[in-house]
Amino acid sequence: MKTALVCGAGGFIGGHLVQRLKDEGYWVRGVDIKEHEYTDLPCDDFQVLDLRSERNVRRAMKAAVGDLSITFDEVYQLAADMGGAGYIFTGDNDANVMHNSAMINLNVAKVASEFKNPPKIFYSSSACMYPEYNQLDPDNPKCSEDSAYPAAPDSEYGWEKLFSERLYFAFNRNYGLDIRVARFHNIFGPQGSWNNGKEKAPAAMCRKVAEVAHY
């Protein structure tokens, strides 16, 4: 049986990923700083841990039973300090967004590289890392992989995502980590945040319509 660690399992995408991995027959451990807000996750093991702590990342990555020098087959790194436009574009949360997310990724890359047989790592990046000048024309967005440079993200959130992409690929070159990166766009759907500034645009619009209809 394959094993997977989902960092950020208490979030929207992480929760759906846990379900998909279980459907595919994986043994899954979920880790997050909080439990999932909307559903009971089908994890084989769920741990509430702050992954800004290297010690907690070591704890999360160790196999559930047996030889603790063995880690998971796959690690899905979705944990981050993030939210919708009301959270990441105001400037009020820039320091936390950059510090907290960078610490998590620094810890995950470092700890994974120390195992004799490191796990495969998937990192969830964001389209926010693309240059602002490539996103000004909604009819002609430039989001090809090679359009990321010259770098000029429009938010500190985007800069941190770009930094962490480079971090993981540096660990690939120097330590042989097997890395995969996906640059997510505006992901939304069931069990996603819908208020408090961390919701995505579609959820925010639905909430506003519902609020107006209520009155």
Predicted ranges, named:
Residues 133-142, 166-215:
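NAD(P)-dependent short-chain dehydrogenase/reductase
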Residues 106-154, 180:
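Conserved Rossmann-fold NAD(P)-dependent oxidoreductase catalytic core, especially the SDR/UDP-sugar
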Residues 51-101:
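NAD(P)H-binding glycine-rich loop region in Rossmannoid oxidoreductase-like domains
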Residues 7, 31, 75-81, 121-127, ...:
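SDR active-site strand-loop-helix element
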Residues 42-54:
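Rossmann-fold cofactor-recognition segment
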Residues 156, 160:
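Active-site helix of classical SDR
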Residues 26-35:
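Conserved glycine-rich Rossmann-like NAD(P)H-binding loop of the short-chain dehydrogenase/reductase
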Residues 4-24:
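N-terminal Rossmann NAD(P)H-binding glycine-rich loop of SDR-like oxidoreductase domains
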